[in-house]
Amino acid sequence: MKLEEFLQQKYNYNPEIKDAIKGYIEQWKSWYKGNVRSFHNYFIYNGNKKVKQHRYTMNMAKEISEDWSDILWSEKCEISFVKEDSQKQFDKLIDELDLYSIINRALEKSGALGTTATVTSVYDILQNEDGMYLDVSQAKVRVDTVDVDWIYPLSWNNKEITECAFGSVEYVNGVKYVICSVHRLNEQNEYVIYNHLFKDSNGNLSEITEEQGTMKEFPTHSNIKWFSVFKPLLTNNLFNNSPFGIPHYANAIDNMKAVDISFDALKNEIKDGRKRTFVRSDMFNYDNGTQKMVFDPEDTTVYQLPSGATKDDLIQSDSDVLRTTQQIETLNTNLNILGSKVGFGENHYHFDGTNLSTATAVVSSNSKLFRRKKKLEIGYYNDILNLIKSVCYAATQFGTYNIDTTDMAIQFDDSIIEDKEAESVRASREVSQGLISKAEYRERIFGETEEAAKKAIEEIEEATPSVDKLLNNADSNDNSSNTDNKDEENNNKGEKDKDNKNDKNKKKDNKNKDLKEE
């Protein structure tokens, strides 16, 4: 029994959905590996027979997928939380899971094969027979990347895949097993994960129902998906209403062929640029002394002439000037066209005769690369957001973490696209001119949510009083000082008046005393 047959019988899976695009997926896998048998294997006729050749390749499908993954996600990207404690716990969790690497691989694989997925799970949970969780103190979260071959959509709409089955292969003591997890919504609109284990005998699967250590039915008690299906935000022009995506180069296959033909021609120009020898057919006979052939019949630089030529035509040779300059120019022209087709714009790739280089300069915000990057971020944002939410929920509900994902924000890295310092200066000017608020400034420059931005501004204003407040305090201090001075002046005046009165009374007493003596 095949896994598709099992899913069809038990979960009403429709195999036609994947069968329709399977041929393209196999083609994309070949290009991603850099070896398309129908293209990279060819023959050259040497005058006697066809000699098998293998075309040199620049493996641009891998290069394109890697470059887009690096542009979209790097260590400069930020995942931020409003609560400081949640941020600290999440930073610890992503280190344990190596989450940034998982996201980067998912972006590359989806860009290379059109679709890939991440699946979140937990293990080392102690559970009783009734399905109650007894101990989660040792529970660990795990995130697996699933290739398109093992993705089986069950329910989807124009926006997303809502129910899906995933397969994976594991070997135990040399025995091959297939593990299948099915994510479905129950009547309460909460996800339940059904796990199945199969023993694989040369492609024939037999389910193992008594396996210990695996929860056959795992209720998540949440509507958060424990899987994320990554697809580039490119319209699937091969199949309408398909849940599968297409790679970055899906509509540039002919351009990749042109690049490899040019590269192969350049390599052969150098390899075959030595003297080419034309030999009459009877010269290919065995040497009488050694019984070995005089010329190697597999050598493409030796061309066998038909018999009947004159004695002077037994062996001839020619040597031409190498045309490497023209070959390199042609190769770079094809690289420019390919780069433009896959969204990088012109001059993204350049071959200098030895190595392939990639443009690293900061590009204009109006460039094709910038616009394609922003478009892809729109689609990948929700995929990454759902992955993070599932990881945080699993670690909180079935582990020892406590992470609040409310108002969580993801900030992509735009340092290669735009000058952040210049953007900050421009945004500051807009704040001073009243064109945008301080909260809008923080949202744009720091990638914060509106709530987080307002909270940060409040904290800053509390720690740093405004100019008006400082002036008001200064006025209050001045008024207080003036009042104190006035009171002091009044007191001094009172004391002076009192002294003057005493002196006046004293003089009067002395005068009365003198009159009495007389």
Regions found by a protein language model. Name each.
Residues 90, 335, 388, 438-439:
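Generic structural marker for isolated residues within well-ordered, non-membrane alpha-helices
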Residues 1-161, 496, 506-508, 515-518:
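Extended, helix-rich architectural segments
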Residues 100-119, 266-275, 320-421, 431:
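C-terminal amphipathic alpha-helical
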Residues 209-364, 411:
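Extended, charged amphipathic alpha-helical segments
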Residues 117-244:
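Extended, regular secondary-structure scaffolds
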Residues 126-134, 281-299, 357, 389-419, ...:
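Charge-rich, acidic-biased intrinsically disordered regions
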Residues 318, 330, 337, 422-425, ...:
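Charged, long alpha-helical assembly modules
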Residues 313, 426-518:
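Activation/maturation switch segments at domain boundaries
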